């Protein structure tokens, strides 16, 4: 999917920053770099729409998953959770 050349607004839940502080620095820096690029195109990368969730997506990032909501009308991305990959986080 493509969007217009206008970038999206990015909002990051404070809990995400807490999660980043608890994981190895190299992983946290890589995840933060991915999050910072999301306003260019939130549909880019290894993403999957979450079943049963209207606007929730997850992006695979190494051993972690970034969960976020896309509000297309407002052109807003809300990153609300980062979790290590498990059988429950795909």
Stretch-by-stretch model annotation:
Residues 34-59:
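A short, surface-exposed loop/turn module that caps and links secondary-structure elements
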């Amino acid at each position: 999917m493509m969007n217009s050349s206008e970038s999206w607004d990015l909002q990051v839940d404070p809990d995400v920053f807490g999660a980043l502080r608890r994981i190895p620095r190299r992983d946290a820096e890589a995840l933060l770099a991915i999050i910072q690029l999301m306003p260019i195109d939130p549909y880019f990368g290894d993403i999957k729409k979450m079943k049963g969730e209207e606007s929730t997506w997850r992006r695979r990032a190494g051993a972690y998953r970034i969960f976020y909501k896309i509000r297309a009308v407002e052109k807003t991305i809300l990153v609300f959770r980062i979790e290590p990959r498990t059988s429950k986080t795909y």
